[in-house]
From Swiss-Prot:
The keyword Mitochondrion applies. It is a peripheral membrane protein. This is Gametogenetin-binding protein 1. The lineage of its organism: Eukaryota, Metazoa, Chordata, Craniata, Vertebrata. It comes from Rattus norvegicus. Keywords: Cytoplasm, Developmental protein, Differentiation, Golgi apparatus, Membrane, Mitochondrion, Spermatogenesis. GO terms for biological process: cell differentiation; mitochondrial fission; spermatogenesis. Residues 226-373 are annotated as: Required for induction of mitochondrial fragmentation. Interacts with CCDC159. Interacts with GGN. Pfam families: Ubiquitin_3. It comes from the Eukaryota. The N-terminal domain is required for targeting to the mitochondrion. The gene is Ggnbp1.
Length: 373
């Protein structure tokens, strides 16, 4: 009866005390939700679940608004022990810097999928991370502590802030070092130009074919070099005496020759021409130039025994370029030298025999003949 006889004021006071109690409960729940709470060790559900969190990166690398609150479910293994489940996080674009590797403000870590073509498996206390295997990433990840903690310990408490910092450095090194190019390898056309230039070229100009044309030489330069080589070979052949032509050796006008033939000693200024001997086999006269002769050797001239003295004298003047008056002597006979004064007689009629010579004597500048010896 006393409870039923309560006044409205007492009811209002009771409701207010109840409201204060509820407010205190709600406030404690809200504060516990805002703090870093440990992982829920509830029983696993029949189907495996994974909470997906996609943080939005700002211009300075900070994490933005989170779409869903991450949940961590611990699975129970066959032996009754609980094992933490991996998390899957969607990371920001590769050109932005990641300061928090896990993408969460809390202490739990997860796994990030960077790009579809990069694969890296990092195992740190039940957490799987897929990323790109680069050299810089491996060097950073080698220093990550891999500790085997208790099987039922939450994953966020095991990794800690140091793991997140190391993993963030690995991602930064990966973004700076990794540059993969998809598709087939494309070679620029400049790579084939050098190979074509290194090859030998074949130039066809009608009947003239030039092969093995090296790099850096133009066809004109090659033709010019070929012409110079042909010119040199032609000059070399021209300097050689002809095998079919008769060979005439030049002899010095000395008193005694190697063959024992005696030649009359005369003044060198008057000595212009010498015919060594008349051969009876071919009826030809062979001659030699004296030592003081300024003409280049070999000088070749053939006279027959039927040629006249005047013809021989005129030919010798042309060859020796004698401008003044000259006369022809026959030397080598026992009586001494003999002057040939009849230009109409032949050499055979003049008595030219084997062992005799012809001497062309020129008048000096004063118009005098050289004195006889």
């Amino acid at each position: 009866m006393a409870a039923q006889a309560r006044t409205p004021r007492s009811r209002i006071l009771g409701c207010s005390s109840m409201l204060r109690f509820l407010r205190s409960l709600v406030g404690s729940k809200g504060s516990s939700k805002s703090s870093n709470r440990p992982l829920n060790r509830s029983q696993p559900s029949s189907s495996p679940e994974q909470d997906v969190v996609s943080p939005t990166m700002g211009h300075q690398g900070g994490c933005g608004r989170k779409e869903t609150r991450p949940r961590v479910l611990s699975a129970t293994s066959s032996n009754g022990k609980r094992e933490p489940r991996p998390r899957v996080l969607s990371a920001a674009p590769s050109n932005q810097r990641l300061r928090d590797a896990s993408g969460l403000g809390t202490g739990d870590t997860g796994s990030q999928t960077l790009t579809s073509k990069d694969v890296l498996k990092l195992r740190a206390q039940g957490v799987e991370v897929t990323s790109v295997p680069t050299r810089g990433t491996w060097e950073v990840l080698e220093h990550l502590p891999e500790k085997k903690g208790e099987e039922g310990e939450p994953a966020g408490e095991v990794s800690g802030a140091s793991d997140r910092a190391h993993f963030g450095q690995a991602l930064e090194a990966e973004q700076g070092c990794l540059q993969w190019v998809s598709g087939p390898m494309v070679l620029p056309p400049e790579a084939f130009i050098k190979e074509e230039e290194d090859e030998h070229c074949l130039i066809d100009f009608g009947d003239l074919r030039l092969s093995s044309c090296k790099v850096g030489s133009t066809p004109w330069n090659y033709l010019l070099g070929l012409y110079k080589q042909l010119q040199k070979s032609a000059m070399t052949k021209a300097q050689r005496p002809d095998a079919d032509a008769p060979q005439f050796a030049l002899k010095d006008s000395s008193p005694t020759e190697e063959r024992g033939e005696r030649e009359e000693a005369v003044d060198e200024s008057s000595l212009k021409w010498c015919a060594p001997r008349a051969s009876s086999d071919d009826s030809n006269l062979k001659w030699c130039a004296p030592r003081n002769s300024t003409y280049q050797s070999p000088l070749q001239k053939t006279f027959r025994s039927t040629d006249t003295v005047g013809f021989v004298e005129s030919e010798l003047k042309k060859i020796l370029a004698v401008q003044r008056e000259a006369r022809l002597w026959k030397v080598g006979n026992p009586e001494g030298r003999e002057l040939l004064t009849q230009p109409d007689i032949t050499l055979e009629e003049a008595g030219m025999v084997d062992g005799q010579h012809l001497l062309l004597e020129e008048m000096d500048e004063m118009g005098n003949w050289p004195p006889p010896e």
